[in-house]
């Protein structure tokens, strides 16, 4: 499994714009791509900005290529996302998952 990581930053006055874009535009599009396994949107509040970290999970680099095109390390940032953010990383990082664990709670 491959994790694709990207960061964007929003103004504190607009804390919900990017999460709404992610939830209603990005996720539905990603779910249509073969090889997409899931995504997480993480938020870190700072005094002067809100940092979002997007982690998407994929079966392979070929699956990512179906989303990102041939330039795998270039961020895919739609105009709506650009409007919701004050800055963002122009590139992404890919990580190979070498171990994963989850806690299963008893009911």
Question: What residue ranges belong to the model's regions?
Answer:
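Short, well-ordered beta-strand segments in beta-rich or mixed alpha/beta enzyme
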Residues: 2-9, 40-71
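Short, surface-exposed ligand-recognition loops at beta-strand->loop->(often short) alpha-helix junctions
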Residues: 9-19
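Residue-level signal for secondary-structure boundary sites
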Residues: 14-16, 62-64, 100
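Intrinsically disordered, low-complexity segments enriched in polar/charged residues with Gly/Pro
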Residues: 14-16, 27-28, 42-45
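An amphipathic, aromatic/His-enriched active-site/gating alpha helix that lines ligand/cofactor pockets
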Residues: 21-33, 57-93
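Short acidic amphipathic segments
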Residues: 33-39
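Glycine-rich beta-strand-turn "strand-cap" elements at beta-sheet edges
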Residues: 40-50, 76-107
């Amino acid at each position: 499994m491959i994790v694709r990581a990207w960061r964007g930053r929003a103004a504190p006055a607009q804390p919900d714009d990017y999460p709404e874009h992610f939830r209603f535009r990005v996720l539905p599009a990603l779910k249509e791509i073969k090889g997409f396994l899931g995504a997480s949107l993480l938020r870190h509040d700072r005094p002067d900005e809100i940092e979002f970290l997007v982690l998407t999970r994929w079966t392979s680099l070929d699956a990512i290529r179906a989303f990102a095109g041939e330039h795998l390390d270039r961020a895919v940032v739609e105009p709506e996302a650009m409007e919701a953010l004050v800055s963002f990383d122009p590139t992404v990082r890919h990580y190979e998952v070498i171990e994963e664990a989850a806690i299963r709670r008893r009911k």
